[in-house]
Amino acid sequence: MITSSTERSASYLEKTAVVQNEHNGDLEISSPGGGPGTANMNPPESVGFSRGQQSLDHSVWYNGALMTFLATGEDTHGQFALIEAVGRRGSDAPPHIHHREDEIFYVLEGEIVFSVNDRTIKGTPGTMVFLPRDVRHSFTIESEQYRMLILVTPSGFEAWFREFGVPAPAMTLPPANEPAYGEVQRMLEAAPRYGLEFVLPQNP
C-alpha cells in the first residue's frame, strides 16, 4: 500500500488527522479540539444521505465494465465519490496521472495488477491500493472478471465516466466485443478539463 506524508494526509481530510494504531492496526480518527474517535463532520448535511441497492439510474458502461456510482459529489458536497466497477479481462487502464484527486482501489473479486511509478502491486480480494494525486499509475486485469470499489477524493472525476460511458441498459457487463476505448482522440482532448494526463509511449 502506498502512503503519503502527514502533511498531505492532513490536506486530504481538511485538517482531520488519521492515526494508525501501532499496537492493533485500528484506525483512529481525530480532529483539532477533539479526541480519538471524533471527526469534523461539518457541514452536518454531508452525512445525511443514503443509497439503496444498485440502480440503472446510477450506472454506465465504460471500457468494458459496469460502473455504478454509489456516491457522487452531489451526495457528499464534493468531498468524495464512490464507484463500484465490475468488468472482465481487457478492462485495463493505460498509464495516466490525476492532478486533482487521490484514489483508493479496494479489490473485492478477481486479480488486478497495479503499476505505480516503477512499482508493481498484485491486487487480490481484500487488497487496498492508495494512489495520491500526481502519481503515474495503470492497472491490468489478470482474471477473467473482477469487482472493485474506487474512492475518488475530492469528487468530480466521476463525470469523466458519465461523459465517455453510455447509460447501462441493464445491470450486466457490456458485450464482450465492444471496443474498449472508442473515442481515444476526444478523450485526449478532454483530459486537461479533468486534470488528467495520459502518459503516452515515447517515440524511439
Spans of features found by a protein language model:
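Short acidic (Asp/Glu) patches
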Residues: 64-67, 90-91, 132-135
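A short, N-terminal "cap"/entry segment at the start of jelly-roll beta-barrel domains
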Residues: 2-3, 8-80, 173-204
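Short, conserved beta-strand element in jelly-roll/cupin
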Residues: 82-89, 97-116, 151-154
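A hydrophobic, small-residue-rich beta->alpha segment in the mid-to-C-terminal subdomain
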Residues: 147, 159-174
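A short hydrophobic beta-strand segment most commonly corresponding to one strand
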Residues: 82, 130-131, 143-160
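Short histidine-centered beta-strand/loop micro-motifs
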Residues: 71-72, 92-99, 140-142
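Structural motif
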Residues: 66, 104, 111-113, 120, ...
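Short acidic-glycine-tyrosine-enriched beta hairpin
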Residues: 118-136
